[in-house]
Structure formats: structure tokens, C-alpha cells
Curated annotation (Swiss-Prot):
NCBIfam families linked to this entry: mthyl_TIGR00027
Domain of life: Bacteria
InterPro entries: Ppm1/Ppm2/Tcmp, SAM-dependent_MTases_sf, SAM_mthyl_Trfase_ML2640-like
Annotated protein name in UniProt: Putative S-adenosyl-L-methionine-dependent methyltransferase MAP_4189c
Claim: Plastid is one of the keywords in the record: no
Binding residues for S-adenosyl-L-methionine: 130, 159-160
Originating species: Mycolicibacterium paratuberculosis (strain ATCC BAA-968 / K-10) (Mycobacterium paratuberculosis)
SUPFAM superfamilies to which the protein is assigned, alphabetical: S-adenosyl-L-methionine-dependent methyltransferases
Keywords per UniProt: Methyltransferase, S-adenosyl-L-methionine, Transferase
EC number: 2.1.1.-
Length: 304
């Protein structure tokens, strides 16, 4: 299904289903004996969504012989990629709060449970922004399993295509205080101009000393749509409404590091391949890797 400017979704369809897939990957990485990450809430959230494919994937019960383009090696590569991504952003928040930041904004938060699982310092406020149905589902599900936030959690039930800066301000956000922003797994679902607008808005709300973390996929400019469709086809054969080729926005866009530097941030990046090496994880072979190619994880600090 082609994206539209006002399309909506739940956690079992479209962009929302990718959040559930990512959470399933975190649940599997949490069970990995290498212990790179610990997300105890990913599994109950995925089970509550109720998509059989992701539940079986999480439990290791998929019949991979019956799924086109699925092999144990490819599944493990996905889990490893999710592990290093999650670890990078977890460490980012620890570093930001160690530096004294006590305001956090998670954009398009999906099934992110960091407000519940990270050791936030006293006085930390975590703002989560996402579509109303997504926010409500996660809040209710985590309440049902007895989870309690480890920081003050404030939810902003609004799509990022709306006036989220105004909604954030209405929830008590203070732009005069340094903020740690996160835009994880988001940019590929934004048109190029919306990506720029997102960073413009963040910059307008960020005091010096604020930080931001995100990832950039250079291959989004000319990604292999046919390979992506082939991989998505295996999902659809098993009742999962994900067609990645139609969900992402391809084409030329500004490189995030260059764009942030131009806005007064000091940005730097590390490739996913480097993160695999850093954590002693085997780098996936090209045929088992993300069809969008290399991923650059970026962190930046507002300097002016």
C-alpha cells in the first residue's frame, strides 16, 4: 500500500508492524547468552500485539523451511543488528544523563520501553511522542504486567506530522533546559523534506548542551526495492501487513551529519559494521544483511 500524508496504523499493520518486528528482535536479543541488551518488556508487548508470526519468531517456533528468504542465519543477523542498535542508543542515554541532562524526548516511540527499563537519575522526565493508539496500547499493556516507569513519563499522543512541538510544550516541556532527543528507526519513513523539518524543529527546541541520536541509511537514496519486496513477501504470506518497499521514502536527502552540523550541532557517526566489531559479533554476509545496506548511527551535541 502506498504511503499517504495522513495514513494511520496500529501495531499489527503498516509502519506500526515494523515497531512490533523491532520489539520481537529486542526480545530475542535479550535472550541471547551474549547479554548485550536487556529489554524485559519487549516480549510481553509483542505477545499483547498478538501477531502470530512475530510471537513464533520470538519463541523460535517458525518453520523457516516454509518461509521464503528466511534462514536461521538471516534471522540471527536481524537479531544481532537489533542488539547493537539498541545498545548504542541505551548507552547514548546513559552518557547524556551522566552529563547532567534530565529531559528526554523519544520521537515515534512505538514499543520502546526505555522509560521503564533504564536507570534514570532522580528528576529525569521522559516524553514519548507517537500516534494515540500506539501510546495507549503500550501504556495499558505495561500497566497490566505491573511495569512502572523509572522516570517521570509524559506521553504526547500525536503523529509527528502534526504540531508536535506545540503538544510537547503543552505537556510541560521546557526548551531552556538541555534535552536528550532520540529518533530511532524513524528517518527512512519520512520524506526527505520532512526529515529536514524534524531536525529544524528539534533545533528550535534545544538549548546548548542538548543532544540527539538517530541513524542514517545512505542506501535509502537508491535501495534495491525488488529485494526488499521479496523479503516483505515472506511476511505477507504469513499474514503480516508489512511491505517495506512501499513504507520507506527513497531518493536523495541531506546527510544527517552534515545537516546537523549546519544547524549548530557537533555530530559524529559510527557504522553498524563498526558496532559489530566493537561487541565481538560476526558481521553478516551481504546476502543475509539488511537490504538497505550499511547504517550509520549518529549522536550530536548542540554547541550554539
Amino acid at each position: 500500500m502506498t504511503r499517504t500524508h495522513d495514513d494511520e496504523w496500529d501495531l499489527a499493520s503498516s509502519v506500526g508492524a515494523t515497531a512490533t518486528m523491532v520489539a520481537a528482535g529486542r526480545a530475542m536479543a535479550t535472550k541471547d547468552p551474549r547479554g548485550l541488551i536487556d529489554d524485559p518488556f519487549a516480549e510481553p508487548l509483542v505477545r499483547a500485539v498478538g501477531v502470530d508470526f512475530f510471537t513464533k519468531m520470538m519463541d523460535g517456533e517458525l518453520d523457516l523451511d516454509a518461509i521464503e528468504n528466511a534462514t536461521p542465519v538471516r534471522i540471527q543477523s536481524m537479531v544481532d543488528g537489533m542488539a547493537v542498535r539498541t545498545k548504542y542508543f541505551d548507552d547514548y542515554f546513559v552518557d547524556a544523563t551522566d552529563a547532567g541532562v534530565r529531559r528526554v524526548v523519544i520521537l515515534a516511540s512505538g514499543l520502546d520501553s526505555r522509560a521503564y527499563r533504564l536507570p534514570w537519575p532522580a528528576g529525569t522526565v521522559v516524553y514519548e511522542i507517537d500516534q494515540p493508539r500506539v501510546i495507549e496500547f503500550k501504556s495499558n499493556t505495561l500497566a497490566e504486567v505491573g511495569a512502572e516507569p523509572t522516570a517521570t513519563r509524559r506521553t504526547i499522543p500525536i503523529d509527528l506530522r502534526g504540531d508536535w512541538p506545540a503538544a510537547l510544550s503543552a505537556a510541560g516541556f521546557d526548551p531552556a533546559a538541555p534535552t536528550a532527543w532520540l529518533a530511532e528507526g524513524l528517518l527512512i519513513y519520512l520524506p526527505p523534506e520532512a526529515q529536514d523539518r524534524l531536525f529544524d524543529n528539534i533545533t528550535a527546541l534545544s538549548a546548548p548542551g542538548s543532544t540527539i541520536a538517530t541513524e542514517f541509511v545512505p542506501g535509502i537514496v537508491d535501495f534495491d526495492a525488488e529485494r526488499v519486496r521479496e523479503m516483505s513477501g515472506s511476511f505477507r504470506q504469513h499474514g503480516v501487513d508489512i511491505d517495506m518497499a512501499s513504507l520507506v521514502y527513497a531518493g536523495e536527502r541531506n546527510h544527517v551529519i552534515d545537516y546537523l552540523n549546519g544547524l549548530g550541532w557537533r555530530a559524529e557517526g559510527v557504522t553498524r559494521t563498526e558496532l559489530f566489531h566493537r561487541h565481538g559479533i560476526e558481521v553478516p554476509a551481504p546476502e543475509n544483511d539488511d537490504p538497505l545496506g550499511e547504517i550509520i548511527f549518529i549522536s550530536a551535541t548542540r554547541t550554539r
